[in-house]
Regions:
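Conserved mixed alpha/beta catalytic, RNA-binding, or beta-rich assembly cores of soluble enzyme
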Residues: 1-71, 92-96, 113
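Hydrophobic, Leu/Ile/Phe/Ala-enriched alpha-helical segments that form helix-helix packing faces
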Residues: 68-71, 103, 107
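Oxyanion-hole/transition-state-stabilizing segment in secreted/luminal serine hydrolases
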Residues: 85-87
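Short Gly/Thr/Asp-enriched flexible loops that form oxyanion-binding sites at enzyme active sites
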Residues: 90-106
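Divalent-metal-activated hydrolytic enzyme cores
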Residues: 108-119
Length: 119
């Protein structure tokens, strides 16, 4: 059975008040979005944040390039987009953050599976 290499990306703004415990619990218990792997062996290769957007954008934006290149070098099988990477609009509909979408699109173009959600 093939070992699945998994990474989780989360929102920089949310990480100020979130320890990531829900994402990690779901991963280790193969619950919620990780249930799709069934009995496959998983390895968490990275749990990382974007470099922000709007007022929270980090000055060093070249760091995000390093993170993206690291994901490619690790040859991850799937990138899970944490629950916090989508926000509700005024009508209550969830939309993926444009910054996260750009990162996910680039990694998807390299053959990495993008999975919406963690817990």
């Amino acid at each position: 059975m093939h070992l699945k290499k998994i990474a989780i990306i989360r929102c920089l703004k949310t990480s100020a008040s979130c320890a990531g415990a829900g994402c990690l619990r779901a991963f280790y218990e193969k619950d919620k979005a990780f249930a799709l792997y069934g009995e496959e062996e998983l390895r968490l290769m990275a749990m990382w944040t974007c470099n922000g957007c709007g007022d929270s954008m980090l000055e060093n934006q070249e760091g995000i390039r390093k993170k993206i290149e690291r994901m490619k070098a690790l040859e991850i099988d799937a990138l899970h987009l944490s629950h916090c990477t989508s926000k509700k609009d005024e009508q209550g509909e969830k939309h993926l953050c444009p910054t996260i979408k750009a990162i996910a699109d680039e990694l998807a173009d390299c053959g990495i599976k993008i999975v919406q959600g963690t817990h």
